[in-house]
């Protein structure tokens, strides 16, 4: 009962802060944003670490989501006035794999201690000017936005700009890798089919080709994370020897 009351109080605080700081926005959109923010990951640690912080920072995250075009990456770092060694990192970007893992590993490698992390994934509806008008399961273009709010400590006196830039760079790499991943999986399937067509002409190599096909199937079935690959063409050389040439693209 006590836990439920605290959750209700926290939800009311966040929604009240959102409506106070974002009065021009749809109450329904703010209410749904508040619900999803609190339900994705328990917010107890954030509230315990910085009492009264959640409502104000929720409004900051909402603004970042709104100010970041749906297909771009937004990063903002806010240092806490009363505890300058602590800060809240906000990010907004198209949903993909490895976002949270990348941020956690990066902050840990830089020597920062994560105190709390919230990670809502939202479907966002916007008007012609890009303003958020609705949040739900299937609104807007249907694409999902992944947002994070991370409270951490250990920030140096002048580290905001460099950290923001590095977070944006890392998330850009994550997006490239995960976007290319699907294309590389499709290419693995294409290569497998190309090998199938070779079996007729190279019947003495069928066992070897079959083994390669099985390996490609194993990769495609989620046993490997594609980060990149190269293709080569084997061409006749001027001296009669075959040459290997890297294929562009």
Kindly label every feature range from the protein language model.
Residues 111-125:
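Glycine-rich phosphate/pyrophosphate-binding loops
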């Amino acid at each position: 009962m006590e836990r439920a009351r605290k959750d209700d109080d926290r939800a009311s605080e966040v929604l009240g802060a959102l409506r106070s700081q974002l009065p021009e926005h749809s109450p329904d959109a703010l209410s749904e944003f508040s619900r999803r923010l609190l339900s994705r990951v328990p917010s107890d640690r954030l509230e315990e670490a910085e009492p009264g912080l959640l409502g104000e920072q929720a409004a900051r995250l909402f603004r970042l989501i709104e100010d970041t075009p749906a297909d771009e990456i937004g990063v903002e770092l806010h240092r806490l006035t009363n505890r300058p060694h602590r800060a809240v990192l906000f990010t907004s970007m198209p949903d993909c794999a490895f976002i949270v893992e990348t941020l956690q590993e990066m902050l840990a490698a830089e020597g920062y201690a994560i105190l709390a992390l919230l990670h809502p994934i939202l479907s966002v509806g916007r008007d012609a000017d890009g303003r958020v008008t609705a949040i739900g399961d299937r609104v807007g273009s249907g694409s999902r936005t992944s947002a994070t709010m991370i409270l951490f400590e250990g920030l140096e006196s002048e580290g905001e700009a460099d950290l923001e830039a590095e977070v944006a760079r890392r998330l850009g790499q994550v997006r490239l890798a995960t976007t290319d991943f699907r294309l590389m999986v499709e290419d693995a399937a294409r290569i497998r089919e190309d090998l199938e067509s070779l079996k007729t002409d190279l019947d003495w190599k069928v066992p070897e080709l079959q083994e390669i096909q099985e390996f490609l199937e194993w990769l495609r079935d989620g046993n490997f994370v594609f980060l990149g690959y190269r293709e080569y063409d084997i061409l006749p050389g001027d001296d009669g020897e075959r040459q290997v040439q890297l294929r562009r693209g």
